[in-house]
């Protein structure tokens, strides 16, 4: 059985590692990012992939910079026949890419060359796509630009969030990898070059991208909310305070108003005007310093003073 080194870090990578184990490959080592402080107490927390690897007694390496000779040589010492990566988080050096007999392959959560980069699942929803998928390709030193080996499409539903789509793509990626490796080893795959002119990019989400722009059409704002759910979460501002908007729905606007204006307050939501006739009913939110709550809870408590005509999103962040 061929010897594999697996490189991955977040939850997305775990079903892929599990599949490799289930398929009986000799997993010589798992390479993941260093433990990081998390939560309010800033406790050092291991990456999900490390936790999974340790359950199976697989050696774990946690290089800070995989491109440094001393660090990548630790990986080469395992003499892998194949390196598989999935959301590892660092670009590999040529010495690693060239070493394995069957190369280095990556499981990427988009239909390349679309959405290269670290946040393809977010952008698929932010851009209102109705389908995305998983690509398995050879790794090169350029970001997600290697030759394509296999792909599978995954539909995006109207109610998918980053969370639900993440799980679908992770499972689809594990299944596709299970089908791809035997074909790769048997020499049955013809790599297809990516058309760089058709490449689009999904760079990691920045804080300023999380803010809701109420002047946009309601459909875009709905995609914005679900495209940042459950992380990092869309937000708006009200009276100088930040509100995280955990969920909202598209509804017909009961009347015209300046974008960001509260145009209706109902039992289960705050209806806000947008840049077109589709309003957004905020149904779940988290005011600064408070817990996440549904709109009904908010309107009974901290939001009891809200009235129609008040405006969201105009103020500078405090």
UniProtKB/Swiss-Prot annotation:
A Pfam match: Formyl_trans_N
Keywords: Protein biosynthesis, Transferase
One function term, GO molecular function aspect: methionyl-tRNA formyltransferase activity
A cellular-component GO term for this protein: cytosol
Source taxon at top rank: Bacteria
EC number of the protein: 2.1.2.9
Binding residue positions for (6S)-5,6,7,8-tetrahydrofolate: 110-113
InterPro entries referenced in this protein's UniProt entry, alphabetically: Fmt, Formyl_trans_C, Formyl_trans_C_sf, Formyl_transf_N, Formyl_transf_N_sf, Formyl_transferase-like_C_sf, GART_AS, Met-tRNA-FMT_C
Keyword check for Nucleotide-binding: no
Cited PROSITE patterns: GART (PS00373)
Record-linked CDD domains: FMT_core_Met-tRNA-FMT_N, Met_tRNA_FMT_C
Signal peptide limits: none
Keyword Protein biosynthesis appears in the UniProt entry: yes
Gene3D superfamilies for this protein: Formyl transferase, C-terminal domain, Formyl transferase, N-terminal domain
Catalytic activity from the UniProt record: L-methionyl-tRNA(fMet) + (6R)-10-formyltetrahydrofolate = N-formyl-L-methionyl-tRNA(fMet) + (6S)-5,6,7,8-tetrahydrofolate + H(+)
Role, per record: Attaches a formyl group to the free amino group of methionyl-tRNA(fMet). The formyl group appears to play a dual role in the initiator identity of N-formylmethionyl-tRNA by promoting its recognition by IF2 and preventing the misappropriation of this tRNA by the elongation apparatus.
PANTHER family tied to this protein: METHIONYL-TRNA FORMYLTRANSFERASE (PTHR11138), METHIONYL-TRNA FORMYLTRANSFERASE, MITOCHONDRIAL (PTHR11138:SF5)
Similarity section: Belongs to the Fmt family.
Name recorded for this polypeptide: Methionyl-tRNA formyltransferase
């Amino acid at each position: 059985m061929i010897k594999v080194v697996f490189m991955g870090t977040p939850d997305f990578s775990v079903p892929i590692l599990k599949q490799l184990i289930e398929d009986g490959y000799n997993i010589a080592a798992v390479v993941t990012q260093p433990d990081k402080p998390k939560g309010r107490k800033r406790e050092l927390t291991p990456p999900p992939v490390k936790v999974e690897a340790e359950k199976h007694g697989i050696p774990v390496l946690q290089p800070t910079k995989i491109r440094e000779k001393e660090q990548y040589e630790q990986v080469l010492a395992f003499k892998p026949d194949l390196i598989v990566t999935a959301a590892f988080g660092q670009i590999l050096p040529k010495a690693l890419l060239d070493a394995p007999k069957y190369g280095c392959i990556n499981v990427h959560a988009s239909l390349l060359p679309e959405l290269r980069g670290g946040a393809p699942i977010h952008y698929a929803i932010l851009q209102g796509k109705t389908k995305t998928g998983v690509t398995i390709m050879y790794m090169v030193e350029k970001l997600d630009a290697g030759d394509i080996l296999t792909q599978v499409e995954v539909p995006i539903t109207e109610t998918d969030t980053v969370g639900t789509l993440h799980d679908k793509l992770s499972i689809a990626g594990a299944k596709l990898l299970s089908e791809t490796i035997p074909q790769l080893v048997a020499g049955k795959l013809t790599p297809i070059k990516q058309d760089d002119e058709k490449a689009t990019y999904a760079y990691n989400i920045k804080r300023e991208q999380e803010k809701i722009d109420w002047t946009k059409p309601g459909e875009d704002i709905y995609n914005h909310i679900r495209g940042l759910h459950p992380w990092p979460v869309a937000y708006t501002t009200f009276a100088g305070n930040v509100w995280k908007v955990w969920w909202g729905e598209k509804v017909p606007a009961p009347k015209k108003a300046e974008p960001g204006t509260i145009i209706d307050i109902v039992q289960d939501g705050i209806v806000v005007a947008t840049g077109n006739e589709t309003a957004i009913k905020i149904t779940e939110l988290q005011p600064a310093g408070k817990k996440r709550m549904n709109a009904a809870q908010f309107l009974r408590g901290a939001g009891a003073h809200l009235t129609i005509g008040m405006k969201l999103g105009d103020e500078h962040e405090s």
